[in-house]
Amino acid sequence: APAGSAVTRQLINRMKLYRVEYAEIEGEEPAPQEEAPKPVKEAKTYAQESKTHSQKVAGSSEFRTFQIEYVQAIELMKQLYTAAIKDNKPIDSQKLLGSVADLFQSRNTIVEMFDMLYNMRTVADSVYAHSLNVALISRMIGRWLRFERHDLDILTLAGLMHDIGKLLIPSDILNKPGSLTDEEFAKIKQHPALGYEILKRQPDLDSRIKKAALMHHERCDGSGYPTGLTEDYIDNFAMIVAIADVYDAMTAARSYRSPLCPFEVISKFEEDGFQKYHTKYILVFLKQIASTYQSNRVILSDGRGCTIVMLNQNALSRPIVQFDDKSCLDLSTASRDLYIKAVL
């Protein structure tokens, strides 16, 4: 959208997609051009409008329904997982799928889904909330890959249960702010095997769900854990869940950093993702995410505002942008110090 145009719901939803509550401007403010608004001022305007939209979404009847369904899904996960761990009871997969189906009802796009998820950031049970988010994202990836309904359901369950082993890790380690010690990280790295052992006692679960718990930290180049498997030995569903897992972690706020901008996330995947993740899955994921921002307003790392006019298929994190004076810049040929810092 050109400078001076109205802030639309679509524009704001894009901002919500990666939980960007405000646009942080780094670097010196560029000198204002004649008859043109200052980029910093423009960014603040969008942030103020988006905050108002966020408040409206949080107060809407649709969000209240989503909030109830989201919390109910987490409570169901708690109940079923606790019973499975403590009493070796079977996990009712159909109940879990029903809870996710409720969340997807009338929310058929990733923008609509994340507009709701953005406002659920205060949920305290991070393992459960993260697992639910990973399930929703994994199902979306499955849709992009045109999976059949049965496979979508299995993939969703794989996302829901991928981190069940973390429930056996001490909470003070899981919730520790800042860096982990080597000893603490070694304990964290036990959770895939612990999760697999829990799910192995569930005879009716599809083997792909169990493998996703065991293998979602494995990487195609052999750099993952717990066993350093390479691509030929990693289950396909585990590779999809791995992408959703990393995506949700990078776009979530942490005590030591703000949520990453979507194009920063894409850039990080481009740096080493094609070695670590299945090429087909990561390409579909990145292209779908990047295409969401076609014609969107963004802020560059030098503070200038511009609009995405074309994607570079070989450099999705660095599209061609157009400034308010109608001049264009291909970020794929620009300095690496110049990049998209915020999506509006």
What are these regions (language model features)?
Residues 63-64, 68-344:
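Histidine- and acidic-residue-rich, metal-dependent catalytic cores
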